[in-house]
Amino acid sequence: MMKKPLIVLTGPTAVGKTKLSIALAKAVGGEIISADSMQVYKYMDIGSAKIRKEEMDGVPHYLVDVLDPAEEFHIVKFQEMAKEAMEKIYANGHIPILVGGTGFYIQAIVKDIDFTENEENTEVRAKWEQFAKENGADALHEELAKIDPKSAESIPAGNVKRVVRALEFYELSGKRISEHNEEQKAKGSPYNFAYFVLNDHRELLYERIEKRIDEMLEEGLVEEVQGLKDRGFTKNMVSMQGLGYKEILDYLDGNLTLEEAVYILKRDTRHFAKRQLTWFRREPEVSWVHKYEYDYDNEKILAAMLDVLKEKGIVTA
């Protein structure tokens, strides 16, 4: 059976994916699925750098502005929603283009990672949750380190939910969750895909990040977060943990001055971009697109991307 086509356009935050994604979609007859853990939420426009209606230029977008901030958005939900969108796009005779910077989300689609076969048992889970309550998160994390050191390395002790999940998985299946995840990643892709990573010189990227945050503040980021707060959204919600939201919330709650909040936001966004790039470097089969090699000209970048897509038989010459 012929593999269905899939295009990925990713890269670190503030690198300039949005504009290029529209040009790409128009050139190949594509529709865009957002692979972004924040743009999926309603009322969170400025801090998530959400694409505006007029920027979409008629290109259909999925997974943008669809969830209430009180709803949890996680990898399994993303995968479900994205696959549903892909079916619609294929039915339209178009090519799905995954656009966004959340590497794990992209991998879940490209590799079609199976999260559902992870058995669940509320009794076992409750036992470990109780253990954490009585002995603390660090003691729980030590239990994980004993049976699955690899998972313990990648899951922080503070993420009790994931630590419990890993312990539960081991108890039920007799298998380490890290091994299960490695097996899933080693699978081939069910798609004929091209995976583009847009990148730039680090110092220029950092400059863009700083500038973008200054612009967000000018556009009314503080007011946006205040509005969310007024609607009853609190900092323990997944949505409010996003970059730009948790820092401004800390300012509004009187824990930081605005200057401190902005300093932390800029610093943490730079760190985030660095982590994104580390993730993409570990991914096999990616096509790096360094903007400076094309004189920062989107037309030249697009032409190079189209060459790759023709080579892979995703689009015809």
Give, region by region, the residue ranges found by the protein language model:
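Phosphate/pyrophosphate-binding catalytic cores of soluble transferases and nucleic-acid-acting enzymes
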Residues: 1-317
